[in-house]
A protein has these predicted regions:
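Terminal and domain-flanking low-complexity segments
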Residues: 4, 8, 110-127
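Anionic N-terminal interaction surfaces
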Residues: 1-57
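Phosphoinositide-binding peripheral membrane targeting modules
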Residues: 39-113
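Low-complexity, intrinsically disordered short peptide segments enriched in small/polar/basic residues
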Residues: 13, 21-22, 28, 65, ...
Length: 127
């Protein structure tokens, strides 16, 4: 089972091109990402622990934060949205920028925690 397909829709080339209209501030390009899930529950999915190394992309536009893993859009959140502050962004590791999402805080059919650790220098990303 592809866990990413349960977390979001496919992020194709057309979607990426559409972001250029929003004014891309930062684009990590295709980088390695460590994906972790803890107690992930929802319709058609249950995983107590999962850790996977994939390729992904982190994009910051003027108005949105987009996190892509395995070709699927995991996070697409306006920067001014009240739930944006519920994302935990950890920049303590000099080789990774980690985004933690508690899915129970978001209006969806899923619960649990996911961690997206992008293998980039956290200094590159300014939110």
């Amino acid at each position: 089972m592809n866990v990413y397909s349960k977390l979001g829709p496919r992020a194709g080339k057309d979607f990426i091109r559409s972001l250029e209209k929003d004014g891309i501030i930062f684009d990590s390009g295709n980088v390695w990402i460590t994906f972790k899930a803890e107690d992930l529950k929802g319709k058609g999915i249950y995983m107590s622990r999962l850790k996977r190394l994939s390729r992904g992309r982190l994009i910051l536009t003027k108005n949105r934060l987009i996190a892509i893993a395995g070709g699927y859009k995991i996070i697409d959140l306006p920067r001014r949205h009240k739930l944006f502050n519920k994302l935990t962004i950890d920049r303590n590791d000099p080789e990774r920028c980690t985004i933690k999402v508690d899915l129970s805080l978001f209006p969806a059919e899923l619960a649990g925690n996911i961690f997206l650790a992008y293998h980039i220098s956290p200094d590159l990303l300014t939110l």
